[in-house]
């Protein structure tokens, strides 16, 4: 959603945290992060469940001449199973909206439910970068996630914008 869209500055910062040949973004959204990842990674896959948004982003990437980004519309877990390949990095920006609960802040309440899917994700990548809301309790996040290597607190003009969780198997 628009309110979760990364700014150019935060997307550029995220791109400095990854390296290698391949990255899959399981929660593609508007693709701002993927555009910057594509400057550092040879092949980026933008996976977005919303058909209309996926089409718009694919069109925008063509206009931006971002030839190393592929757009796949569909459920990210099914996409991982279908592709059945290892990635150097996986990026996840879970939706912090829940139909039943409204706006949520615990990782287990987000979509996808990263804590429940972590073992599944590790089958496809040993390095995972997760973006969360700055209001997420870091202690709670550490309890929900395993293998946390680094937590980045990203701020612009003295305002915390997001937390980035580097997780390695």
Question: What do these predicted regions represent?
Answer:
Residues 1-169:
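SAM-dependent transferase fold signal centered on methyltransferase-like domains
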């Amino acid at each position: 959603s628009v309110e979760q869209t990364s700014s150019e500055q935060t997307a550029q910062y995220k791109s400095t945290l990854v390296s290698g040949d391949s990255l899959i973004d399981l929660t593609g959204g508007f693709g701002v992060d993927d555009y910057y990842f594509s400057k550092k990674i040879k092949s980026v896959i933008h996976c977005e469940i919303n058909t209309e948004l996926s089409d718009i982003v694919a069109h925008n990437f063509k206009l931006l001449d971002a030839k190393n980004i592929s757009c796949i519309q569909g459920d990210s877990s099914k996409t991982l199973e279908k592709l059945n390949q290892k990635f150097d990095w996986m990026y996840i920006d879970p939706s912090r909206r829940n139909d039943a609960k409204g706006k949520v802040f615990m990782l287990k309440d987000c979509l996808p439910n990263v804590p429940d899917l972590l073992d599944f994700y590790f089958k496809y990548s040993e390095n995972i970068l997760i973006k969360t809301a700055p209001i997420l309790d870091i202690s709670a996040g550490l309890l929900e996630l395993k293998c946390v290597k680094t937590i980045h607190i990203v701020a612009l003009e003295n305002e915390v914008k997001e937390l980035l969780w580097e997780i390695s198997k």
